[in-house]
Amino acid sequence: MSVITKIHARQIMDSRGNPTVEVDVYTESSFGRAAVPSGASTGVHEAVELRDNDKSVFLGKGVLKAVENVNTVINSALQGMDVTEQEEIDAKLLELDGTPNKSVLGANAILGVSLACAKAGAEYSALPLYRYIGGTTAKTLPVPMMNVLNGGAHADNTVDFQEFMIMPIGFERYSDALRCGAEVFHSLKALLHKRGLSTAVGDEGGFAPNVESNEQAIELVIEAIGLAGYKAGAPTDKGGLGDGHVMIALDPASSEFYDTEKKKYVFKKSSGRELSSEEMASYWADWASRYPIISIEDGMAEDDWEGWKLLTEKIGDRVQLVGDDLFVTNSKRLGEGIEKGVGNSILIKVNQIGTLTETLQAIDLAKRNGYTSVISHRSGETEDTTIAQIAVATNAGQIKTGSMSRSDRMAKYNELLRIEEMLGDTAVYPGIKAFRV
């Protein structure tokens, strides 16, 4: 029987030592478990993560209220529902909460239930989750965005931009691309050590050295690619991209250094330089001409629509421009962006929106309008590997899930290795074809 008999939540710990929600869903013949991630730099338009705010316990970060909501309200309402009816389950969860941002029950409570139900449904159907969600066409392994060097809100250093990532695009198999990423990661570690810079890793497994400038940060990554025996591709030479093995992706997290009063982008961690929206867009255009950059996420602040438009006009034809804080996995905000012609890609974080159904709707809307989707982790993660399954299920072609260290990140990469093995000769690794620029 596929009828839900019990839903139980508990408080567990995430990769940063903060509490998060884990949910178990039972039917008479199947079981599903999901753990919920949490972000450090969060967009103001995200669904609400319910915290206890009792400063005497876990510094206010406890999630017992969300756990109680699952064990009482949600458990009672969903018992007797068919676990394979995902859309009905998610609609019921939205009805129970009754708010647009899930502030009553908490997006962390709702998401845990939604994902655990999907896993229980997959087990009941005797299918891997990627096949259960995506059907027989699910066969594309994603190109990894590997966060190897950190700054911004993710590091105590002099780098303004949050993430410098490598994307191994010049390969035919996911497993070979993963090997490349690991080799570049270790080459970067050796390079930093040789320069007397820190090799300690941050929340997502990337290094956070105290380098002299934003430029030095990206140049270190490019040098490490060469030291590993690979070639960095050039973003403007479309015909020659196949000659390169690795390209650079950036997540500046520009909302974090945007001064809303001055309406300026302030490089407060490095030079103190202040740039207007037009100057910031020109700054990225200059970087895209000088460095092998294939993707920039949140190159402009989340509500700087004019700046986003300028950036898209300048480099949107040759660089993937990903909206994270801008779109927050929300179909309504993505629709607004499509109408205004800003960006050409959306970052997909399941906890930004709160249900699997809404996540899949955002991916579908992006696909129908020529936008790419990048399935993403959060800085606070667990051993849960659902996002790896979603990446393959939707044939998204790209995944952002940290560096080549920390088991909370490696769990996703390893799950993708298992899926590649399971798919065998039908597995597709898109490489540069994952991009539409």
Swiss-Prot record:
EC number: 4.2.1.11
Residues forming the catalytic site: E204 (proton donor), K349 (proton acceptor)
Top-level division of the source organism's lineage: Bacteria
GO molecular function, one term: phosphopyruvate hydratase activity
Compartmental location: Cytoplasm; Secreted; Cell surface
Cysteine disulfide partners in this protein: none
Pathways involved: Carbohydrate degradation; glycolysis; pyruvate from D-glyceraldehyde 3-phosphate: step 4/5
Annotated CDD domains: enolase
Cofactor(s) this protein requires: Mg(2+)
Cofactor notes: Binds a second Mg(2+) ion via substrate during catalysis.
Keywords: Cytoplasm, Glycolysis, Lyase, Magnesium, Metal-binding, Secreted
Family in the record: Belongs to the enolase family.
Biological role: Catalyzes the reversible conversion of 2-phosphoglycerate (2-PG) into phosphoenolpyruvate (PEP). It is essential for the degradation of carbohydrates via glycolysis.
Protein's name in the database: Enolase
Origin species: Chlorobaculum parvum (strain DSM 263 / NCIMB 8327) (Chlorobium vibrioforme subsp. thiosulfatophilum)
Source lineage: Bacteria, Pseudomonadati, Chlorobiota, Chlorobiia, Chlorobiales
The encoding gene: eno
